[in-house]
A protein has these predicted regions:
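Outer-envelope beta-barrel architecture signal
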Residues: 22-30, 62-66, 105-111, 139-141, ...
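Gram-negative (and chloroplast) outer-membrane scaffold detector with strong preference
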Residues: 55-130, 159, 188-190
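Residues that define the transmembrane beta-barrel architecture of outer-membrane proteins
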Residues: 26-28, 46-52, 85-91, 107, ...
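Short glycine/proline- and aromatic-enriched beta-strand/turn motifs that initiate or cap beta-hairpins
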Residues: 19-69, 183, 187-189
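Membrane-embedded beta-strands of outer-membrane beta-barrel proteins
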Residues: 52-54, 91-95, 111, 147-149, ...
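Extracellular loop and loop/strand-boundary signature of outer-membrane beta-barrel proteins
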Residues: 39-42, 77-84, 131-137, 168-173
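Cleavable N-terminal export/targeting peptides
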Residues: 1-26
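Predominantly the C-terminal beta-signal and adjacent terminal strand-loop region
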Residues: 75, 150-190
Length: 190
């Protein structure tokens, strides 16, 4: 009987997780995400159209955090029977604030903003298109800001599943001023 009671206590103790190491001020994390840009009048999933990113996060007070992200986005712009590749390499620095959470602090909805700078490359830097036409838009340095919305789910005390959407405003771009995207990934809080 004692063995069964000790076994039951041990199973209950291991099934319950301690939340003492979550969302501590100055706690850092590393996040890796993949996603797709949302292009108006285009299918969501397209060949050679993707976004990847790596972020470093640092929790501040009251469950909010600051982040620094490096993002690479690739999409194809249709031109006749071919495509013109558009690539962006961006560095984002921002802040996320919790809007909602459950009572156990397992799921959060965050909203935030960021400032960004980067480089936009159009047609791999070539100014002549495959049919001989001259491309008037050009590759250049871009800057701007963004709005972010994310749902974060704790899978364990240090591992989170993150699903998010963002809208970036790229000033200086010849192609699009507003670039929405959706992404999903994982964060490890150290």
């Amino acid at each position: 009987m004692k063995r069964a009671l000790l076994l039951l206590i041990g199973m209950v103790a291991t099934a319950l997780t301690a939340h003492a190491q979550r969302l501590l001020p100055r706690q850092t994390g590393v996040e890796i995400t993949v996603g797709v840009p949302v292009i108006q009048n285009e299918k969501l999933i397209q060949p050679e159209t993707f976004t990847v990113g790596v972020s470093f996060t640092r929790y501040l007070k009251a469950e909010n955090y600051a982040f620094l992200s490096a993002v690479y986005e690739r999409q194809n712009r249709p031109y006749g029977k071919s495509n013109v590749p558009l690539s962006d390499a961006l560095l984002l620095a921002g802040y996320m604030h919790p809007l909602l959470s459950d009572g156990g602090k397992n799921a959060f909805v965050y909203a935030g903003f960021s400032a960004l700078a980067g480089y936009e490359e159009l047609n791999r830097g070539e100014s002549v298109l495959p049919d001989g036409a001259e491309l008037l838009d050009r590759s250049r340095i871009v800057g701007g800001g963004g709005l972010h919305l994310a749902v974060e789910l704790f899978l364990s005390d240090h591992l989170l599943f993150v699903v998010g959407g963002r809208g970036l405003f790229l000033f200086g771009s010849d192609v699009y001023l507003f670039r929405p995207a959706i992404s999903a990934g994982f964060r490890i809080n150290l």
